[in-house]
Curated annotation (Swiss-Prot):
Keyword Signal assigned: no
Chain residues that bind hexadecanoate: 61, 93
PROSITE patterns for the chain: DEGV
Pfam families attached to this UniProt entry: DegV (PF02645)
SUPFAM superfamilies associated with the record: DAK1/DegV-like
Single GO term (MF): lipid binding
Protein name per the record: DegV domain-containing protein DR_1986
Domain DegV stretches: 3-278
Source organism per UniProt: Deinococcus radiodurans (strain ATCC 13939 / DSM 20539 / JCM 16871 / CCUG 27074 / LMG 4051 / NBRC 15346 / NCIMB 9279 / VKM B-1422 / R1)
Amino acid sequence: MSIAIVTDSTSDLTPEHLAALGVTGVPLYVLFEGQLYQDGVQLSARQLVEGVRAGKAIPSTSQPSPAEFAQAYAQALEHADEVLSLHISGQLSGTVGSARLAAQEFGGRVTVVDTHTVTLGLGLQVLRAAELVRAGQSVPQIVQTLERVYPQADLRFTVDTLDFLRLNGRIGGASALLGGLLNIKPLLVVRGGRVDAGGRVRGQKKALADLAEHVRRYVSQHGGARVAFLATVGGEEDRAAVRAQLSDLHFQDMGDHEIGAVVTVHAGPGAVGVALEPLSA
């Protein structure tokens, strides 16, 4: 039984990376200045940030329609027996709901998974699923593996400001970090499928040190890890600084990644983070 994988643009894997894996990415939408743009197709994260910095209002986001997922599934099933569809947390977006509605049209040939995470947290699950497909595992076997990995996975990041999360209603438990003293940097986690408070420190240098130390603890606790480094536009130097602090640590390096337009709408420019998974489930 051949298996095709479908995901959405919040995996923040580039179109080239998805194509190399044979994975289909369905874009979410950014509503910006009264126009709807497909994430990464019609609007890049850099264009979005440049617009906001020029004084345009912070945009909002929207999920793909069930019809768009149905089209992606139909195309995938032209050359595969089954589809495994992996998506952003249902507590952060209605995307997985659209995917499930579309899946009903295909008589059990499409399995939709809420990964309970976003950006490279989702991206790492897509990469693992692609590896397991190549290894010959079935859809139920892959889903079982992902369900074992998810509770152990971690996504931790810091943002330049909480305003973007607050204005778009995605702040969740991180609302406890609103306000406070000047130069206090929030540390955020995606936990249980939602954004939550991970703590706060004074100054960006300490925030980056916290991210690096978090990776060290995770690698120690899990006997190794897959680690992806991520940043929104403006956070590239800070991402490199976190990586530099880990130059002596052994882990499976999953690369540097730019967060796309949809997640940037919520995280804002200058965000930096790490996505982590155990090496094996």
